[in-house]
């Protein structure tokens, strides 16, 4: 479900900085993966997250990303919304109530930045010409000066998860590190 967190936090931050933001989600409702994570209570962060626990061909990326927005930062946001939580094993934090609280918080953060969320669509193609990205939604095209693709991998196909992010990365010449199973800590 971390792809949903990343997407929503990226969108909220950009929107709150005055950017016009549109989130396209192929799911019928946002946060579908969050709602099933942690048995419906959402394992929303891990206070033991550290750069050396990430598999990457660029270990400095994890260090830089985690220094800019830490698990403590996200926990402070959760606390500011009055969401009760508890720690399970190895620093895993879960909602006392429901994962719906985290989804609502993320959507509210986006709303503070006037982020528009469109659900139920399917991105057919993405192109880049003359400094702009065009996203074909099957009959409608959205154009933007910047594009962030934040998707999960193909881990839960029955939820609609696909490898589309890998295809898009390759399309734009980005190096792809093939995913592999990893234990959750």
Where are the model-predicted features located?
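Residue-level signal for inorganic ion chemistry
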Residues: 78, 106, 169
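Glycine-rich active-site loop/strand segments that organize a redox cofactor
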Residues: 41-89
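Predominantly flavin-linked oxidoreductase catalytic cores and closely associated redox partners
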Residues: 110-185
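Glycine-rich FAD pyrophosphate-binding loop
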Residues: 15-39
């Amino acid at each position: 479900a971390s792809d949903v967190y990343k997407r929503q936090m990226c969108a909220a931050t950009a929107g709150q900085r005055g950017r016009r933001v549109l989130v396209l989600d192929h799911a019928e409702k946002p946060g579908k993966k969050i709602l099933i994570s942690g048995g419906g209570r959402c394992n929303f962060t891990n206070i033991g997250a550290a750069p050396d626990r990430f598999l990457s061909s660029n270990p400095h990326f994890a260090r830089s990303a985690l220094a800019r927005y830490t698990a403590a930062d996200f926990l402070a946001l959760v606390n500011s919304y009055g969401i009760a939580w508890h720690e399970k094993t190895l620093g895993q934090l879960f909602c006392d109530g429901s994962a719906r609280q985290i989804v609502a918080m993320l959507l509210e953060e986006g709303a503070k930045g006037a982020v528009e969320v469109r659900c139920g669509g399917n991105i057919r193609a993405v192109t880049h010409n003359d400094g702009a990205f065009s996203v074909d939604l099957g009959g409608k095209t959205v154009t933007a000066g910047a594009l962030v693709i934040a998707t999960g991998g193909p881990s839960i196909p029955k939820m609609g998860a696909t490898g589309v992010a890998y295809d898009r990365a390759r399309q734009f010449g980005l190096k792809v590190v093939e995913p592999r199973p990893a234990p959750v800590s």
